[in-house]
Amino acid sequence: MRGRRSIVPVSHPLLPRASAVVERALHDTHYLDGALDSLRSAVRDPGAEGRALASMAGDDVEGVVVFGLFGGTSGAGRLHFVAVEHRARRSGVARALVSAAIAALGESRARFVLAELPDDPRALDGSRAFLEALGFHEESRVDDFYRDGIALAFMRRELSPE
């Protein structure tokens, strides 16, 4: 990491650099288009259902998280995705981003956070273990959701009441 890390909202001027991080992190996966759509939507119209944060080291975007509340629910938080530059992996960037997202969801009165994880270890190596290390557990799953052999796993983390 170069310099001090800060977590900032992804603004319109920052969107191209944040998008580039997502493209590099997910370029060989089936999940890139959905992640970019979520990011653009969160920046274009930030609100309870979608917000985006970036981890910055100086002027460099190291990672991005998109999160929000499920529309029409009471206290159901959602982690859309987190993406980190390859060079910044295993340095606490993803943990810092998810922690900031969870804190913001808690401030929005979320009771829990749900991450809808494609259970695709070849494309998203380490994602399940990362979420489990942050206190998420598999609540349920839909087998063959994305394609044959690739399930949708619902990973849940309870938030402490204030």
Question: Would you name each region that the model predicts?
Answer:
Residues R95, D119-R141, D148:
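Conserved active-site alpha-helix within GNAT-family acetyltransferase domains
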Residues G50, I150-F154:
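Short hydrophobic/aromatic beta-strand or adjacent loop that forms the aromatic wall/cage
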Residues L105-D120:
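Conserved GNAT acetyl-CoA-binding A-motif
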Residues G92:
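Glycine-rich phosphate-binding loop
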